[in-house]
């Protein structure tokens, strides 16, 4: 039977069964093929949509995956990556044993070659190197680069081990690269993280506007829902795509707006100006007066580059861009947009507030209106038109039509965005601007209306953000810098007072810079690929390989970071372990372990717990110097008073305590399912102590979950209990009295809003205790703070140029991103034969006019070169992505087209998120 006949047979068999008709023998082939399969629900491994899938196993291997028809997110659909969840675990070069660089004697040697070693030898060397650095440099000399792909229990264990055990806040996720600007936007505007809306908005809205979000490829299941909504009422429902190049998302759009890089800042202000100056009657005055305040902040904040503009590690070609961190000469456009500060084109702006980039203060509506004045249609079109071949008047019509859609009375509008917004030198600003427009119109936190940040990774929300795996965060939106938050955390973790450090560690990009500077000498990488995914990669690879440090990479495959490492730990993949993810609409989903890990691979939780066994309280809870200004006190005496011994290990105190052991290994949820951490498994892996690992004997995942959820209950982040999630297809938090929340801050739907303002429609309770000084557009005039009392903030943020723009020597913009078929750096998907065949290499998408000028033809190889590095890539002039003249697009999934060697490591100064979307390059034939 061939594939087509099998599918026909399966369909016919299902139809007969539903009709109560006996299945003929000729139609039973599909049923026979599935004989002995066990199906169970799980979450997709890939993007932040959070699709539910069904996983089939037989004989200890995953044999099939399909969309879960009961999953409310995807309703049985999968995208092309989703259908290959089963195959990501079975690549030919899967790492199955620990690998250590050794010399001829079998001893660790940084210049040695990888050799298979035991888990015991791996941990022996890892422990020795960790102790060496910890003793030399203190808690912040060691670091963890984590992930928005951590399961929630993994992220929680990592935070507890690093911050509670080693007293180090130097743990940061790769979500710093993708969602930090959205996070800071939420925190600055709402005082609490994550979207107010949910995916139900798609079916309820009249208008979908995508800003820097190629949803057709990056969130294809959501785009299927958008397409369905559009087709259900094509005349009423409008779709707009705003991007710096044409994408598949434009295929459905009524309006496509190709804008110049960074000019989204100007476009948002134009829309706000249209509202305030030309349609003041459309301002929802009741909403704005009751629920909002107007704010502004400094503009002289730099670009997130190194503060030392003459740093010895910079190449001469990098110095011009590096200098902008200290000051820059204002352009003609900036002379207009910053005129409210008394500045003009040609002035030098000194970046004096880089260290206070997040500062802001309350202003009046009149000041806000004054700042919007320059953003006329003519000015904005001149700044924002991104396609040189487009007629300026046609572009103006599009901008006006865009504004009209937002402004139209009774029109519901959802604004979606992803990396085009977040990976931006003013990423926090542009997130704030989206809320600005929605607030002015009263179109936020309503069914079918709202500004909605889409998450890129499967648990950037559920783990990186909610758990707090950022250097400055703790669970449930708490921060290490707040003494009260540290106190709450110490009590929940049963730590002595003063254990936690109040000093944030090095964020993702700074950790790489600190590695290059010798300030960090031990990094443990988990569930991501930093040496491929971090911009200006040549610097960081050289630092890792040529300097005195030790890099541990937990990975299933030999990606770039694994190749850079000193020690590789083989890690279990998603369905080889128990886990949970949290998606972009605050939906939390759990799954069971379906199969045993390959070879001797072990789950990340196991790796962390085994490492924690090697450190006693006396090793890490004594007096510890963080930096020249901060020394952590010894808490050993306080620990003794709590019943601990200085001989207790971190494992004993943090993970195998009395509370943990209450969670039985005989839990019925585990019946007929493996749990490697709890029981060990039939592989009889020889563990980190040289003995067979037979399990911890208690339900570690359930313990971690139930302890973690205590942080959010009663604080607006309520999660359900462990058992509930195994019965349902996910729930959107806050989950109060067993009921999920669709729209936050709306008293009709959100119990926390209802509690905060029982007689009102809205309450932005994240700001219930917040207060701001007052001033004007130029700064603070009165330091006395005015309470916000459940109000959100409407920010004014000006247009500013990026720090590096095309020039005579580097005449093209470079933008990077993903493609539908591959995930991030391709570590998993490039090993799936079907996905590899579909897209075997990253291409350089270019406009035909540019190719003609360069004498380049379709499929020819070119060099893409910046001030930082260069790579070869094959030119595509006819593909899915269609850049305007002057811009090229190169995805980052292909390690053989290592585009992050070319990209600039500038970041948003507030969020510290890298801007991968704009730098200057030159193109020439290879």
Swiss-Prot record:
Cofactor binding annotation: Binds 1 [4Fe-4S] cluster. Binds 1 molybdenum-bis(molybdopterin guanine dinucleotide) (Mo-bis-MGD) cofactor per subunit.
Enzyme Commission number(s) from the entry: 1.9.6.1
Gene Ontology molecular function: any one: molybdopterin cofactor binding
Listed cofactors: [4Fe-4S] cluster; Mo-bis(molybdopterin guanine dinucleotide)
Binding site for Mo-bis(molybdopterin guanine dinucleotide): 81, 149, 174, 178, 211-218, 419, 423, 529, 554-555, 577, 604, 816-825, 900, 917
UniProt-annotated binding residues for [4Fe-4S] cluster: 44, 47, 51, 79
Quaternary structure and partners: Component of the periplasmic nitrate reductase NapAB complex composed of NapA and NapB.
PANTHER family with a match to the protein in the record: PERIPLASMIC NITRATE REDUCTASE (PTHR43105:SF11), RESPIRATORY NITRATE REDUCTASE (PTHR43105)
Similarity comment text for this entry: Belongs to the prokaryotic molybdopterin-containing oxidoreductase family. NasA/NapA/NarB subfamily.
Full protein name: Periplasmic nitrate reductase
Organism: Campylobacter concisus (strain 13826)
Species lineage: Bacteria, Pseudomonadati, Campylobacterota, Epsilonproteobacteria, Campylobacterales
Gene: napA
